Amino acid sequence: MVNPFIKEAKEKMKRTLEKIEDELRKMRTGKPSPAILEEIKVDYYGVPTPVNQLATISISEERTLVIKPWDKSVLSLIEKAINASDLGLNPINDGNVIRLVFPSPTTEQREKWVKKAKEIVEEGKIAIRNIRREILKKIKEDQKEGLIPEDDAKRLENEIQKLTDEFIEKLDEVFEIKKEEIMEF
């Protein structure tokens, strides 16, 4: 049976890791990815609607993202939403589809993206350490109240530390993969 402290720590750390992976997936890297459009909303009949719910998004060629709306009347709305975003891309509307051509990023731009990815991962590490601190505090409180023997508390502290180290190592791996993806061009 898994101890409730370990279970809680593992679940919270796992959610943190998933959140960081999701943030990194949405990050622009110079390589076309439909995920970067997930945050862009189009005012569709008065409802802010994500682009991926209004169109098919695919990668065409090496540096082009193609957005093909199911309803052609939203083409200009999608174009306007992309222009208003902070993506820094110029949509090309040919009347049927919108093309987003990703220019080759400069070395300086890539280094900026790597720095941003590192900041995101560092935030994740801080969150993991805060989870550790929170769980260790609960263990100490239970120990003081006599609910957990000292030996068990020490064992739990060691297990929580191992879990923390494991998740921080996973965050480092995620960062290295993202860094490689950014610098690959």
Curated annotation (Swiss-Prot):
Q: Where in the cell is it found?
A: Cytoplasm
- Name the Pfam families for this protein: RRF
Primary place of residence? cytoplasm
For this UniProt record, the keywords arranged alphabetically read as follows:
Cytoplasm, Protein biosynthesis
Family statement drawn from the similarity comment of this UniProt entry:
Belongs to the RRF family.
> PANTHER family from the xrefs?
MITOCHONDRIAL RIBOSOME RECYCLING FACTOR PSEUDO 1 (PTHR20982:SF3), RIBOSOME RECYCLING FACTOR (PTHR20982)
Q: Does the keyword section mention Nucleus?
A: no
One GO cellular component term of this record is: cytoplasm
What the entry lists under InterPro entries is as follows: Ribosome_recyc_fac, Ribosome_recyc_fac_dom, RRF_sf
Entry function: Responsible for the release of ribosomes from messenger RNA at the termination of protein biosynthesis. May increase the efficiency of translation by recycling ribosomes from one round of translation to another.
**Top-down, what is the taxonomic lineage of the species of origin?**
Bacteria, Thermotogati, Thermotogota, Thermotogae, Thermotogales
**Entry annotated with the keyword Protein biosynthesis:** yes
One GO BP annotation of this record: translation
Lineage top rank: taxon = Bacteria
Name by which UniProt lists this protein? Ribosome-recycling factor
Gene Ontology terms for molecular function: ribosomal large subunit binding
Q: Which gene encodes it?
A: frr
